[in-house]
């Protein structure tokens, strides 16, 4: 939709229709709502002043970019938002040329803009300029300031729209958020600042010194001091819902041909009164009734996250040494109740995964029992800290890895399929996984008192595949596997975490063909060498199930063990392929990639038949 030349009234009508479309689709499909509604006028302003087919439009996280999608030829397709093979909930270049870069994790936008600006400068292009939209929540991460530090020195022309709604996902945390929220009306100060700068240019040296001191004192009460000290131009705060003011400011910033930060104050959930209230509830939502705001499906009260939360709360009440941290996801990781109950022992440190891990390393050194509750996809942001600050000193930090496996509608930037591979590489790391809710309780208890080094346990977003009561649960024993079913054929199913449930369901489907054995590894590091050796004498063909990538995964660990001890077994991975997994409902995605029970059963059957055929050829 071309917004150039449209009147202010027409642009306001466009904004209204965009909000209506977003509400219509998100109430049906689910998605990121409040941040999206709050950014509508800012995005309309961007499209009215800049050209997304030419200027790199870079959205931090990009969950707030729905209006951008609607303005760039995806109005009808938007009905498929976050559905399998439909419109992504984030910017995606393969979906549209107007989506400059893929996003999903926070605080990358300014670095991308600096890189784009360098390319524009090297190409000697005069008519292109990066435009960034970043929320105040993302400004709590250090990557932003690494980029701003270089930008202030290099002075690449760009416009950075800082969307300040005094909210990230949860309650804003830290000095940066407090600094932004204290911003005062900026026009008066912009006017005074301009007059002071003109005065400085005409005063003799002695008087100029006094005027310069006056300017420095003025900065103490203006909201832009932080950015100006970094060498950037600052405009604001402006009303992020006033299109006239937004467009005028964007035009001024564009004409300055410098790095300019526009500080816009907005209201999350703008235009939908119900969503203008509670902070976290309306960030990411499932389908809901538009008139009442009530979810169409009640959330499960016994999700793995809830089980983890309740178990850790019980342990924290019993043991004052139990502490914990989350990075801007207290509700999503289940730490909200603990932050509320024990505010001096559980912390939300904002979008700062590196800081979260390193700070817990120090607590572990001081004799505390720190839990880092974090999504699998976000833990990778702190990989160096896990190695350097936790691993080398063998500190007993406990990593509770939520969303392990396929997470669904958020797509490739959020799938939790790499953690087994990247954690298994770390010396002295213990890596385990529960198979059920009851097993998860035991995992949390085991991790609490584990003292040999760092320990991690992973669990899925949705319910475990394995139903409760199928197998009796017992406490975890360090490095010990558990034999669950004995088979009469030479086929053994090896499960890890949620893979145990998948293996069990496949065994039922194939019961008429094979009577298989089933073992729950429980630990992929260290492996239970004794039990594995015993199993190698009973079963020739091992099929390995886990909810993670096969590269560096559980089967890889078993193949390393096989090579080390010389076990005469065939190890076949039923894990996820070495690919990024697209968005869609978990059930649809699993069916498409052959990771549901039907697909896995067929894969097992084909692999075993291939082995049988090859043996016949050798006879």
From Swiss-Prot:
A GO molecular-function annotation: magnesium ion binding
Sequence positions that bind Mg(2+): 136, 165
Biological process according to GO: 1-deoxy-D-xylulose 5-phosphate biosynthetic process; isopentenyl diphosphate biosynthetic process, methylerythritol 4-phosphate pathway; terpenoid biosynthetic process; thiamine biosynthetic process
Binding sites annotated in the UniProt record for thiamine diphosphate: 63, 104-106, 137-138, 165, 272, 353
UniProtKB keywords: Isoprene biosynthesis, Magnesium, Metal-binding, Thiamine biosynthesis, Thiamine pyrophosphate, Transferase
EC number: 2.2.1.7
Pathway: Metabolic intermediate biosynthesis; 1-deoxy-D-xylulose 5-phosphate biosynthesis; 1-deoxy-D-xylulose 5-phosphate from D-glyceraldehyde 3-phosphate and pyruvate: step 1/1
Keyword flag Magnesium: yes
Cofactor descriptive note: Binds 1 Mg(2+) ion per subunit.
GO CC field: cytosol
Catalytic activity: D-glyceraldehyde 3-phosphate + pyruvate + H(+) = 1-deoxy-D-xylulose 5-phosphate + CO2
SUPFAM superfamilies in UniProt: Thiamin diphosphate-binding fold (THDP-binding) (SSF52518), TK C-terminal domain-like (SSF52922)
Top enzyme category: transferase
Subunit details: Homodimer.
Primary role: Catalyzes the acyloin condensation reaction between C atoms 2 and 3 of pyruvate and glyceraldehyde 3-phosphate to yield 1-deoxy-D-xylulose-5-phosphate (DXP).
Sequence similarity: Belongs to the transketolase family. DXPS subfamily.
Protein name, per record: 1-deoxy-D-xylulose-5-phosphate synthase
High-level lineage: Bacteria, Pseudomonadati, Campylobacterota, Epsilonproteobacteria, Campylobacterales
């Amino acid at each position: 939709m071309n917004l150039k030349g449209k009147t202010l009234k027409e642009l306001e009508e466009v904004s209204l229709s965009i909000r209506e479309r977003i509400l219509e689709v998100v109430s049906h499909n689910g998605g990121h709502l409040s941040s999206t509604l709050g950014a509508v006028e800012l995005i309309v302003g961007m499209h009215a002043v800049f050209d997304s087919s030419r200027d790199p439009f870079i959205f931090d996280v990009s969950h707030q970019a729905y209006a951008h999608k609607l303005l760039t030829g995806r109005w009808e397709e938007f009905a498929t938002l976050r559905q399998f093979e439909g419109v992504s909930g984030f910017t995606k270049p393969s979906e549209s040329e107007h989506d400059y870069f893929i996003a999903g994790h926070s605080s990358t936008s300014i670095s991308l803009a600096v890189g784009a600006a360098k390319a524009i400068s090297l190409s000697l292009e005069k008519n292109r300029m990066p435009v960034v939209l970043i929320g105040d929540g993302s400004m709590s991460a250090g990557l932003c300031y690494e980029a701003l530090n270089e930008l202030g020195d290099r002075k690449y022309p760009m416009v950075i729209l800082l969307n300040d709604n005094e909210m990230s996902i949860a309650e804003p945390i830290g000095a940066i958020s407090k600094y932004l929220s204290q911003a005062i009306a900026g026009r008066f100060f912009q006017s005074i600042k301009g007059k002071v700068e003109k005065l400085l240019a005409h005063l003799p040296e002695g008087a100029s010194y006094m005027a310069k001191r006056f300017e420095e004192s003025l900065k103490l009460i203006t909201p832009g001091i932080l950015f100006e000290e970094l060498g950037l131009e600052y405009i604001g705060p402006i009303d992020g819902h006033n299109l006239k003011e937004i467009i005028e400011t964007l035009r001024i910033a564009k004409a300055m041909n410098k790095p300019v930060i526009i500080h816009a104050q907005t209201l999350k959930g703008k235009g939908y009164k119900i969503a203008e209230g509670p902070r976290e509830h309306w960030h990411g939502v499932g389908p809901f009734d538009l008139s009442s705001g009530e979810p169409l499906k009640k959330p499960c009260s016994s999700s793995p996250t809830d089980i983890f939360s309740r178990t850790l709360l019980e342990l924290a009440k019993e043991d004052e040494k139990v502490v914990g941290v989350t990075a801007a996801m207290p509700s999503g990781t289940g730490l909200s109740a603990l932050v509320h109950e024990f505010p001096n022992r559980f912390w939300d440190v904002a979008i700062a995964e590196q800081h979260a891990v390193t700070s817990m390393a120090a607590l572990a050194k001081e004799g505390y029992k720190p839990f880092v509750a974090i999504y699998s996809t976000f833990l990778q942001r702190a990989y160096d800290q896990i190695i350097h600050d936790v691993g080398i000193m063998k500190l007993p930090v406990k990593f509770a890895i939520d969303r392990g496996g396929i997470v669904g509608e958020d797509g490739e930037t959020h799938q939790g399929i790499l953690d087994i591979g990247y954690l298994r590489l770390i010396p002295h790391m213990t890596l385990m996984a529960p198979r059920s809710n009851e097993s998860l309780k035991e995992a949390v208890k085991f991790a609490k008192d584990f003292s040999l080094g760092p320990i991690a346990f992973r669990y899925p977003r949705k319910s475990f595949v394995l139903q409760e009561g199928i197998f009796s649960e017992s406490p975890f024993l360090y490095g010990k596997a558990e034999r669950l079913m004995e088979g009469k054929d030479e086929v053994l199913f090896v499960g890890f975490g949620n893979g145990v449930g998948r293996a069990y369901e496949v065994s039922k489907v194939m019961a008429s063909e094979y009577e298989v054995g089933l073992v729950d590894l429980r630990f992929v590091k260290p492996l239970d060498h004794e039990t594995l050796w015993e199993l190698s004498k009973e079963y020739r063909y091992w099929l390995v199930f886990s909810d993670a990538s096969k590269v560096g995964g559980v089967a890889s660990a078993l193949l390393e063990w096989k090579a080390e001890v010389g076990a005469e077994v065939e190890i076949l991975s039923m894990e996820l392929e070495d690919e990024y997994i697209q968005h869609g409902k978990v059930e649809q995605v699993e069916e498409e990639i052959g990771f549901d029970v039907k697909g896995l059963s067929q894969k097992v059957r084909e692999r075993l038949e291939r082995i049988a055929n090859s043996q016949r050829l050798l006879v």
